[in-house]
């Protein structure tokens, strides 16, 4: 599903996380499974993979059984082909019967400051998106990294002096999104509209599974964060994102195409290739500002919170629905792996359901 940041620009959401709700924390430490070797800035690989267009079915639904209750889970993927249309009939049928529709796991970092005071904090959040003391990226980054950044910025963004004053994680994410767009890919806009449409028609609301974390001193936290200088994790985030933009977009497109076509074999083979936004989130979670406020252990807390919501849905409703990233469904350490010991069966979209098979055999046997 698309990321929601309460109306505040996603471009500085990582820096202003303390003032922005509903930041998804899953896959926070994910990295591309095969690191891409740095290349000469002039040797940027053009896309070799054709991004699909038109109508496509998506990967299907995972089924989690507990007794006669079923939780259906749609695996999400970002980015996806920009010009595809998702054939969502199967999901719409399940949503029409679901007693509850769970939102994706995540964390909502907020405070009891009220809407008006929250609006007055937006300038502080925007300042937190910039480098301390007005520094520019050419002053902060190693020379070789800045050379790569500059070449890719010229290619995908053009002349934009303002971006040079933004923190590395934010600046490189804007570059990443521009590169995706130029290559027929996008983040969001495929799955969420379908869910919203069905929920609106049924008069239902999405049931959030986000962990609520309160910050007593958001303004002070933003002030502290603004003072924090460049850390090794910040440079690693930028460097790895440049690797993807320079050499890894064909693999990104292959995974996007696989989701669209429902090619589970390719999705399994490429499991672990995490969202670049989520990969860079880990650099924020390692800041002193985050550690002092207990935000550095969010991954385990968010997972436990989602598992509790899934347990409740399975206990209370014959049919329920949720979304998780494909990585969390396929990985051995993901949310689905943690849920497996708590339920009777977990079935992938390409796995037969024993109950359905028995029913089908009974019908065949009764047919003269």
What are these model-predicted stretches?
Residues 19-22, 365:
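Intrinsic disorder/low-complexity segments, especially N-terminal tails and targeting/processing regions
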Residues 10-12, 65-67, 314-316:
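Short hydrophobic "helix-edge" motifs at membrane interfaces and signal-peptide entry regions
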Residues 1-10:
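Bacterial N-terminal signal peptides that target proteins for export
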Residues 9-19:
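Bacterial N-terminal signal peptides
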Residues 288-368:
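A cross-kingdom marker for long, charged
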